[in-house]
Amino acid sequence: MKKNFWFWGFTDSAETWNGRFAMIGFMAVIFIELVTGKGLLYLSGLMN
């Protein structure tokens, strides 16, 4: 079985992909906050 092959359900490869996407999303939020100087909740209109 390939490590990066996608299988449906709670498998090791699915959890690996989930972790990768979570890290990308987290870094995107940090980048947006650094560039704009405002938090994500403020930019989305939840903290107005």
UniProtKB/Swiss-Prot annotation:
<dbReference type="GO" id="GO:0016168">
    <property type="term" value="F:chlorophyll binding"/>
</dbReference>
<keyword id="KW-0150">Chloroplast</keyword>
<keyword id="KW-0148">Chlorophyll</keyword>
<comment type="function">
    <text>Possible role in chlorophyll and/or carotenoid binding.</text>
</comment>
<keyword id="KW-0934">Plastid</keyword>
<keyword id="KW-0157">Chromophore</keyword>
<dbReference type="GO" id="GO:0009507">
    <property type="term" value="C:chloroplast"/>
</dbReference>
<comment type="similarity">
    <text>Belongs to the ELIP/psbS family.</text>
</comment>
<protein>
    <recommendedName>
        <fullName>Uncharacterized protein Ycf17</fullName>
    </recommendedName>
</protein>
